[in-house]
Amino acid sequence: MEVILLERIGRLGQMGDTVKVKDGYARNFLLPQGKALRANEANKKKFEGQRAQLEAQNLERKNEAQAVADKLNGESFIVVRSAGETGQLYGSVSTRDIAEIITANGFTLHRNQVELNHPIKTIGLHEVSVLLHPEVQVKVMVNIARSTEEAERQAKGEDLTSIEAIYGIEEQPLSEEVFDDEDEAEDQA
């Protein structure tokens, strides 16, 4: 089905473009959400008549998103999850979890605005993209740790998945003298 886009949609096109999409995508998403019109002569004339108004609305939404982006850019959010000794999470942190954390900190965000290729399954600092508007994207830091104390240590740059962090720095390897004594005892026997 051919549709006329009423706003910029990633991987499809800009406002005003006539693009061919699958029927289900048009019927179930683009048309009900008001993001597109069916491409016919009547709708093309209707779109051209409303083009200036649509561009003004788009610019207003973009300016609002840019204001939020200025506040959100570079922010760091802490997610506390249980994990094993090696830093592997029991479960994962998904787009929904990240959206809930950001929303709890006073920003309005939906999970489909968080761009994550795959769920996060390890502790550490992870950079996540947030798409506030089709033309406004911002990066935030998600600090995943077992506790808030660990999150503070990670924020300072400490690697909590290293051997020293797991077993402690005081752990010393056995000295060679212990092995030498055993060898002498075996020789005497």
Curated annotation (Swiss-Prot):
Keywords: Ribonucleoprotein, Ribosomal protein, RNA-binding, rRNA-binding. GO terms for biological process: translation. GO terms for cellular component: ribonucleoprotein complex; ribosome. Pfam families: Ribosomal_L9_C, Ribosomal_L9_N. One of its GO terms (molecular function) is structural constituent of ribosome. The keyword rRNA-binding applies. PANTHER family: 50S RIBOSOMAL PROTEIN L9 (PTHR21368). Binds to the 23S rRNA. This is Large ribosomal subunit protein bL9. It comes from Brucella ovis (strain ATCC 25840 / 63/290 / NCTC 10512). The gene is rplI.
